[in-house]
Amino acid sequence: SKDSKYRDYYIWRDPIDGSEPNSLESCFGGSAWQYDEQSGQYYLHFFSQKQPDLNWENPEVREEVYDMMNFWIDKGIGGFRMDVIEMIGKQPDKMISSNGPKLHEYINEMNQKTFGNHDLLTVGETWGATPDIAKLYSDPERNELSMIFQFEATTLDQIDGKPKWFTKPLDVLGLKHVLSKWQTCLEDKGWNSLFWNNHDLPRAVS
């Protein structure tokens, strides 16, 4: 309902010429906009239609997230793994889905209001990070995250133009180059993450 106090917890836009507000695409395929007949508007979902994106520009949304995080911190958890953290600063009207201009402002605020004064590990998932971007997250002086994990090494065996489940033999020299680059670039500004795969990728041993 447009009258719900939670309406602005999500991202809604009016149709344009009877269709989607713009051409943003879902990571699962198709449009990132889903039409809601009851309200006559579209809501944004970069993943499943059952996972509408939160409106991080709404300070009440951010405070709700921080309250949930502090609940678990008080329970004694050891840290947080933040899925696609680079997308919380999205600006859909400008066709920006990742690395938006307020991204690091939000993460710094999160740090100050939740885990910043605790001995916790925080790791953010970033599909588009370069070493320089990674340091924006993990530089201790910036008070954001402990580290990120990125996917440059894990995508070396992918075949251009084919789904990620189709792979080619891994270039070992290329792998060494990527791992060395990240290890060197983050030497004094954060931790590098070493992993082969996750639930979004084919198994390296298959």
Regions found by a protein language model. Give the residues of each.
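Active-site and adjacent substrate-binding regions of carbohydrate-active enzymes
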Residues: S1-S206
